[in-house]
């Protein structure tokens, strides 16, 4: 039926093939500093592009609504067993198609519309799914938000007071733009004191946690959700880890609650990524991620930029650009012209609009994957500062772009 020699993307759909090739070139020739992006291994991509994409498998291993699932059962069980071993979890669901759907699955399992939840404010580094009014979490539930204190660390005392005042049914921990270590044990004590569930969204920190270089929330939380890409370096998808007593409720919430047939090719890719993350090499990689982030942040500070919270203790940092009189939007564009990819991001109490912002978010996972070390991280920090000091100077942009080209040639991703 299918002629492998002829059924290539290039032959079947030249337009898509061209876009893919252009994106391949961009990934090779640009320095990727978006904190939520990374490069998956060829093995992960091969699993995701396998024949498993053809198989419907509604249900769970050993209990499917379709025949012919004996081999995908093996795949899903391996993914479950590996992610449990990776994080020390009692139970796991590997079917969520995204981190947002993983969060939604917990909400659907444990809450009713109108219940009160408490999460970190999006304006202070939280995530849309932690109660933002534009997200379903903010529309379905009564939301109380906690944020940062004057030192730009999480205000645990204020969170404690809010929890006792509002008695939320569920407290959400985790962030999308927060550089310090989160005290999950302290938040668990707050939740226990008010009779709330604790859900930790560790999407940004999962790879660091797997390697033991960032605090593990699993011993303290009722539920832990995550994406499988970002610092974990797997395919795009989600996972829910939970205490064994909640496994049946969570499984029912995912299927048939909010999803139908699982994406078995993606679950296979998750399993491969989990196996990679269980290796000693992955721990070494994450240690380098932390070191590169520290060097990058220190370099930017030396060049007159302010890092929100004063430092980074993880892979991510939020850079306040106001000292350079440039917005996040303009900085993103200028750095993009120099082939350095970042994303504009609001800083705490940002006076600018969300699509403009006063900051950019930077992360070290992708550049570390391609082999950058502290020396390269320092150089990247100086290149960023050069662009931000002269964002409209063509000569500066051209010089930085040439230095980026030299770096990316010396440290290829897939070539």
UniProtKB/Swiss-Prot annotation:
The record, for Pfam families, names: SHMT
Please write the reaction equations for the catalytic activity of this protein. (6R)-5,10-methylene-5,6,7,8-tetrahydrofolate + glycine + H2O = (6S)-5,6,7,8-tetrahydrofolate + L-serine
GO CC terms on record? cytosol
| Pathway the protein acts in | One-carbon metabolism; tetrahydrofolate interconversion; Amino-acid biosynthesis; glycine biosynthesis; glycine from L-serine: step 1/1
Gene Ontology molecular-function annotations: glycine hydroxymethyltransferase activity; pyridoxal phosphate binding
Q: What is its EC number?
A: 2.1.2.1
> Where can this protein be found?
Cytoplasm
Give residue numbers for the site Plays an important role in substrate specificity: 229
Q: Which top-rank group of organisms is this from?
A: Bacteria
Q: What does this protein do?
A: Catalyzes the reversible interconversion of serine and glycine with tetrahydrofolate (THF) serving as the one-carbon carrier. This reaction serves as the major source of one-carbon groups required for the biosynthesis of purines, thymidylate, methionine, and other important biomolecules. Also exhibits THF-independent aldolase activity toward beta-hydroxyamino acids, producing glycine and aldehydes, via a retro-aldol mechanism.
Q: What is the name listed in the Swiss-Prot or TrEMBL entry for this protein?
A: Serine hydroxymethyltransferase 1
Write the gene name. glyA1
């Amino acid at each position: 039926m299918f002629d492998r020699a002829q059924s290539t993307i290039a032959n079947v759909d030249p337009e898509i093939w061209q876009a893919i090739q252009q994106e391949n070139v961009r990934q090779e020739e640009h320095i990727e500093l978006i904190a939520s992006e990374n490069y998956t291994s060829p093995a992960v991509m091969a699993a995701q592009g396998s024949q498993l994409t053809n198989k419907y498998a509604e249900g769970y291993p050993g209990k499917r609504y379709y025949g012919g699932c004996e081999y995908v059962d093996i795949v899903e069980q391996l993914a479950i067993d590996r992610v449990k071993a990776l994080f020390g979890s009692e139970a796991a669901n590997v079917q969520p198609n995204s981190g947002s759907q993983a969060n939604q699955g917990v909400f659907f399992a444990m809450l009713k519309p109108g219940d009160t939840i408490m999460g970190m404010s999006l304006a202070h580094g939280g995530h849309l799914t932690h109660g933002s009014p534009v997200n379903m979490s903010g529309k379905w539930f009564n939301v109380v938000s906690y944020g940062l204190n004057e030192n730009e660390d999480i205000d645990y005392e204020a969170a404690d007071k809010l929890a006792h005042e509002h008695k939320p049914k569920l407290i959400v921990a985790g962030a999308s733009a927060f550089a310090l270590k989160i005290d999950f044990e302290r938040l668990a004590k707050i939740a226990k004191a008010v009779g709330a569930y604790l859900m930790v969204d560790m999407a940004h920190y999962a790879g660091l946690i797997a390697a033991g270089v960032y605090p593990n929330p699993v011993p303290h939380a009722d539920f832990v959700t995550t994406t499988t890409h970002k610092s974990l370096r797997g395919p795009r998808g989600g996972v829910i880890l939970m205490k064994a007593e909640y496994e049946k409720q969570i499984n029912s919430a995912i299927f048939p609650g909010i999803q139908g047939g699982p994406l078995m090719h993606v679950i296979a890719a998750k399993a491969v990524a989990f196996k990679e993350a269980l290796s000693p090499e992955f721990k070494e990689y994450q240690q380098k991620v932390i070191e590169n982030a520290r060097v990058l942040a220190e370099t930017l500070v030396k060049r007159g930029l302010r890092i929100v919270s004063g430092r980074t203790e993880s892979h991510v940092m939020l850079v306040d650009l106001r000292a350079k009189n440039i917005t996040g939007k303009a900085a993103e564009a200028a750095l993009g012209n120099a082939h350095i990819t970042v994303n504009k991001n609001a800083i705490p109490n940002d006076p600018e609009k969300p699509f403009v912002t006063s900051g950019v978010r930077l992360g070290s996972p992708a550049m570390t994957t391609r082999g950058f070390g502290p020396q390269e991280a320092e150089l990247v920090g100086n290149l960023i500062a050069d662009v931000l000091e002269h964002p409209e100077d063509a000569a500066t942009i051209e010089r930085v772009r040439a230095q980026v080209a030299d770096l990316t040639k010396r440290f290829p991703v897939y070539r």
